[in-house]
Amino acid sequence: MTPLELRANGIRFAALTDGPDDGPLVLLLHGFPELSRSWRSQLPALAATGYRAVAPDLRGYGGTESRGPYDLKTLAADVAGLVDALGRESAVVVGHDWGGVIAWAAAHLHRDKVERLVVMNAPHPRAMNKEMRASDEQRKRSRYIFRFQIPVLPERLLSRDRGAQIARSLRGGSHVREVWTPEELDHYRSAFDEPHKLKGPLAYYRTGFRNAVLRRRVRLGGPVEAPTLVLWGMHDRFLSPSFADEEHLRRYAPNVTVVRIERAGHFVQNEAPERVNEELLRWLGR
């Protein structure tokens, strides 16, 4: 894996890349509280089969500039800008958690840029809005989002003791906790060990919550046209398994395939990397 810097949609992105420069492009988008490093098992696997795999730190994370806005329309435009910056017409876009929400939005708003879509443990934005209004269970699972609306305090709590709460969140949100070795967790703790390093990541939640309350939702248009794969770790503490219902998903992506991964939780690409790689590469090879 090689570090890479890109300018897209008006800001500088830090990224990791692997694979031949002329290979088909796969763009991998991480979630919270993660970094491009969360794709460390997928980047070499994709490269070994001839893909050019690129995983950026999202806007406001890690080595990427922390500059708003952080609304879904802007974040989807980041994806289109990265595809352009890499000199391509389109890409396979893979996303987990917040990266998956952004990938869904990009597949709606920048249809020409997303030739195939892969989403891991991330609800469709419309489905999440509906569940948050209708489901006591999902509101309970998402109670951390409400806590994140408090100014200043979440940044301080998450960053104190050298990001110890970040480590607890990664382990606590996983079904297979042993993948988070102390050495691995140190990479994430150091990325979020000061309050200012969390300003951008928490702005995703604050902007999304405010826009939902004010009903300023982005207009996504019709269903996703790109072939879509949804991989879902079934022991997800934060998201209802109903989000992985194939019949439900066909409302948003008619050409969808759903694969449920029973022995994994929310951080599925870290908890079950071999299974994720197997399913991803099989589907891409169709």
Language-model regions, residue ranges each:
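Catalytic histidine-centered segment of alpha/beta-hydrolase-like enzymes
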Residues: 264-273, 277
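Conserved HGGG/HGGXW glycine-rich cap/lid loop of the alpha/beta-hydrolase fold
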Residues: 17-63
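Short hydrophobic "strand-cap" motifs at the C-terminus of beta-strands
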Residues: 29, 261-264
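Short, flexible hinge/linker loops that cap or flank conserved catalytic cores
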Residues: 7-9, 19-21, 26, 222-224
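N-terminal cap/lid segment of alpha/beta-hydrolase-fold proteins
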Residues: 1-12
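Flexible "cap/lid" subdomain of the alpha/beta-hydrolase fold that forms the substrate-access gate
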Residues: 11-13, 52-54, 61-94, 98-260, ...
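A short, glycine- and basic residue-enriched loop/turn
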Residues: 35-36, 101, 264-265
